Amino acid sequence: MDTWKFYDITHSRHVVCNPTNEAKLGRLVELLQLAAGADVVDIACGKGELLLRLAEAHGVRGVGVDISPFYIAEAERKRSARVPEAEITFTLMDGAEFQPDAPHSFTVASCIGASWVFGGHEATLDALTGMAAPDGWVIAGEPFWLREPPEEYLRAAGLTRDAFGSHAENAEAGERRGLELVHTFVSSGDDWDTYEGLQWYATGEYVRAHPDDPDLPELRERVAKDKATYLRWGRDTVGWSIYVFRCRPG
């Protein structure tokens, strides 16, 4: 089954494709207080919700990058409907291959919930710091361990113990790079339940509407496995947060 088709189906009901909520995203947008025309880059932008809200609230310019053709198409549709005059572009590409026109040229550089693009949280912070201007913002969304992960969970989820750090370790990774941690938006159990539950719901609706899709057996199997892993271990083992860092002034 095509990877991006899978995520398009399972995340079809999500506005934000991460285990956070729209209220927290709105608070992040309000917190930033960006000037009109500020330049923003969002790596692995999903359906473009962060960029669109920043354009609506502050009149920013920006580029969103994502490897999913389904998400880029949805982001373009939303841009045309909500901010048709905004200088916002969405680009279909691997975020790791994105190269800004100049280093340290963006007021905001973000990668929320997709550190796998760069090979982990610390590498993501390195990449974003290289894009962010002096006194700019580096924003990362990242899981963290709530407790020592059971071996059964690691096997079921296909993870290793060093896949994530603690909440404090995620924050300290930015501070070691000279970034100032100014805020975190930590997800609740309800945020996680909504994120996971919408995937189950969307899958069920898709199965009912497309009974002849040859990908249904794989789709059902993957979602059922992920559901069981989440309910047995994941909900009590993995947290998630948006980390908001400020760069040093020039």
Regions found by a protein language model. Name each.
Residues 143-161:
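Short, glycine-/aromatic-enriched active-site segment of Class I SAM-dependent methyltransferases
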Residues 183-250:
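Conserved Class I S-adenosyl-L-methionine
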Residues 44-48:
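Class I SAM-dependent methyltransferase "Motif I" SAM/SAH-binding loop
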Residues 49-97:
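Class I SAM-dependent methyltransferase SAM/SAH-binding core
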